[in-house]
């Protein structure tokens, strides 16, 4: 059984006990539940449901595992022959969600 959900501006294909990494979700602590109710597609053994735009009555229950920062991405600006170099770094924050249950 799997589902395709729309969350935080992106689509994720999820299965039970899977951990997904999404952009940081504010105001939720690790251990809390987050309900994803925008289910686009739901597939059971032989039953498949596609939403228009979302599957009615379907939801995915997740648990917040952790908040963290991704690895550093370096941004370099460089102009040759002008002695101009700038280096900057960025670490994107993320939230790890564990899929507990898929209903629908």
Curated annotation (Swiss-Prot):
PROSITE patterns recorded: RIBOSOMAL_L21
Coiled-coil segments on the chain, per record: none
Keywords attached to this entry: Ribonucleoprotein, Ribosomal protein, RNA-binding, rRNA-binding
Biological processes, Gene Ontology terms: translation
A GO MF term: rRNA binding
GO cellular component terms, A-Z: cytoplasm; ribonucleoprotein complex; ribosome
The family this protein is said to belong to: Belongs to the bacterial ribosomal protein bL21 family.
Quaternary context: Part of the 50S ribosomal subunit. Contacts protein L20.
Reported function: This protein binds to 23S rRNA in the presence of protein L20.
Name recorded for this polypeptide: Large ribosomal subunit protein bL21
Annotated source species: Petrotoga mobilis (strain DSM 10674 / SJ95)
Gene: rplU
């Amino acid at each position: 059984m799997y589902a395709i959900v729309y969350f935080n501006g992106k689509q994720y294909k999820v299965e039970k006990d899977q951990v997904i990494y999404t952009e940081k979700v504010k105001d939720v602590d690790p251990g809390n539940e987050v309900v994803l109710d925008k289910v686009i597609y739901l597939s059971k053994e032989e039953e498949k449901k596609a939403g228009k735009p979302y599957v009615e009555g379907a939801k995915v229950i997740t648990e917040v595992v952790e908040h963290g920062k991704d690895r550093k991405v370096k941004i370099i600006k460089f102009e040759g022959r002008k002695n101009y170099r700038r280096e900057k770094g960025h670490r994107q924050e993320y939230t790890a969600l564990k899929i507990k249950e898929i209903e629908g």
